[in-house]
Structure formats: C-alpha cells, structure tokens
Amino acid sequence: MAPSSVDSASLCSDIPNSAPPSPSTALSSPARSSPPPQHPPPAESTGLDDIFGSSPPPTAGLSAEPPHTASSSHCEPSDLPSLRRQHVTAGYRDGISAAKHEHVQRGFDAGFPVGAQLGMRVGVVLGVLEGLVRCSPSASSSAPGKRSESGTTAAPSLDILQLYDLAKSELAVQKVFGGVAEIDSEVKPEQDSRLKLEKAGEEVVSKWEETVMRLLGNRS
C-alpha cells in the first residue's frame, strides 16, 4: 500500500474524534454537573428587626420573656374587684330601700283602719273627761272639802282632773300599742297582724270607756 493512501486513511479516521460536540450535548452536560442550590442561613434577630419587618413571630418574643416578668404581668391591680364591691353595695342598698317601701306601705294599709277606729274611741273618752273637768268647779278657786257658791264641793273636781291627766297618759299611742310585743306569743304567726293591734288597743280603750260610763252614771 502506498504511503499516501495510509496517511489519508488515518486522517479520515481522526476527523470524527476532533469534531465539535452537537448543540444538544453541549446544553445537557452542564445541567447534570451543576451543584444543588444552597439556602442562606437564617438571619439573627436584632434590635432593628421590627423596623425592617424581619422580626420573629410574637410567640417567639413571649417565650423569650423572663419568667418573673410574665408572672408580674398577671399580678397587676385591676378595677374589677372595686367595681364588683361598688355594685354589690349599691344593689344591697337598693334592695333594702325597695323592701322597706313595700312593707311600710303594706303596714300602713293594714294598720290605718285599726288605728282610726281606736283613735275615735279614745277621742270620745278624752272629750267626755275634758267636758266634765270644764263643767266642774275649778280646784284652784276652792279648797278640798270646801263648798263653793253653787253648793258643790271641790273634791270631785280634783278627782276628775286627776282622772283626765291619767287618761291622757295611758291613752297615748305608745301606751295603747305598747303591748303588741306581749301579744306576739299569744297570737299565731299565720294570723293577720291587725289582730295584734286590735287586741293590744282594745284592752286599754275598753277599760277607759267603762270608767267614763261609770262616772257619767254617778253624776246623773
């Protein structure tokens, strides 16, 4: 074989090895050899994080709070206890006022008729005694046992005057209804309170009515 033909054949065999790579091979080869992406490390929080918007979530700030600070925030004074005491006191006073008004009105409605009836009877007794005192000779103008110009003695006038003063003392409101406390033990609790008033006043007023009627019978 001629040298020229051998050289040409060797040159032809070397041409494909030195040919440039195809475009597809050039584009795909770097993708296979590229390293994985690296994420940057988390930035540390600083005092300016709130300004630039990179501050940690609120839970992180609460967890970083010292224990004594967190406990002291729960122990701060509040207005709720004082407001509760004020409302309790105001409600207590309003309840007392409402109950007092209701029971006072109920007691007035129940006791007024009883007191009016007894008062009229007491007025009759005192009026009769006062009339007898005015009709009798004055005790100051005559001595006891001495006859006056009309022929009567002054002793009866003194008796009527003393009787009139005693009647005014015993027929006072405090004395007439003073025995209600003693009658509480005799009257049953379920009975009406008007029975207590009637029973307490009836004893005193009836006694003086009998006294006046007896006195009028003696003078007639």
Swiss-Prot record:
Family annotation (Pfam families): Yae1_N
Which intervals of the chain are annotated as region Disordered? 1-81
Start-end of Polar residues biased regions: 1-11
Task: List the InterPro entries hit by this protein, alphabetically.
Answer: Essential_protein_Yae1_N, Yae1-like
Instruction: Provide the disulphide bond pattern.
Output: none
Which residues are in coiled coils? Answer: none
What ranges does the record give for the region deca-GX3 motif, renumbered to this chain? 91-131
Question: In the UniProt record, does the keyword Secreted occur?
Answer: no
Subcellular compartments: Cytoplasm; Nucleus
Any GO BP: protein maturation
UniProt biased composition (Pro residues): 33-43
What GO cellular component is one of the record's annotations?
Answer: cytoplasm
State the UniProt keywords alphabetically: Cytoplasm, Nucleus
Q: What does this protein do?
A: The complex LTO1:YAE1 may function as a target specific adapter that probably recruits apo-RPLI1 to the cytosolic iron-sulfur protein assembly (CIA) complex machinery. May be required for biogenesis of the large ribosomal subunit and initiation of translation.
Q: Would you identify the family this protein belongs to, as annotated?
A: Belongs to the YAE1 family.
Quaternary structure? May form a complex with LTO1.
Q: What is this protein called?
A: Protein YAE1
Give the gene that encodes this protein.
YAE1
